[in-house]
């Protein structure tokens, strides 16, 4: 009987980990959407909201990391569960970095005078692709969809290419 209760508790802990990870992913998606909107509108109020959200994303990262460590130490997961917990640890590191980058963009909006070019298609495409990649990454993790995960990884090159175009445009004054 105790084994059944402990197994149920363990399952609940894994579900809670997934829910927290999904919430963190959604927070990152929102940060990117808001960053792009704040850039377009030069909205310093929205920029401040993004910076606050960046701090919250960092708190989420620490909370999830703590949950993962407790699961590893107290439950000693094996096989698929161990892979899930290990993957969660890697994912939260990347999500936190995304949150920090969104906060950095917001800080630029607050401090730098710039003209936003509405025709900056690479920037728009980069924002949209990044948001979709986060969504797909979360889906691949929760559904354990290896094919979707691999396809998402391949799309990272597209975002890198778009970033280079954006950077080139900014440096040349064309954005």
Predicted features along the sequence, with ranges:
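Cytosolic, long alpha-helical scaffolding segments
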Residues: 1-175
């Amino acid at each position: 009987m105790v084994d059944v209760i402990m197994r149920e508790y363990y399952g609940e802990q894994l579900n809670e980990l997934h829910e927290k990870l999904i919430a963190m992913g959604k927070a990152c998606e929102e940060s990117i959407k808001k960053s792009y909107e704040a850039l377009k509108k030069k909205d310093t109020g929205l920029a401040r909201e993004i910076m606050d959200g960046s701090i919250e994303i960092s708190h989420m990262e620490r909370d999830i990391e703590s949950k993962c460590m407790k699961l590893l130490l107290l439950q000693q997961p094996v096989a698929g569960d161990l892979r899930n917990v290990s993957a969660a640890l890697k994912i939260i590191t990347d999500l936190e970095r995304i949150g920090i980058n969104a906060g950095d963009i917001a800080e630029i909006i607050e401090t730098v005078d710039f003209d936003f070019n509405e025709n900056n298609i690479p920037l728009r495409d980069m924002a949209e692709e990044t948001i979709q990649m986060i969504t797909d990454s979360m889906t691949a993790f929760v559904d354990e969809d290896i094919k979707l995960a691999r396809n998402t990884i391949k799309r990272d090159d597209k975002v890198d290419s778009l970033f280079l175009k954006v950077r080139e445009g900014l440096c040349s004054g064309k954005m």
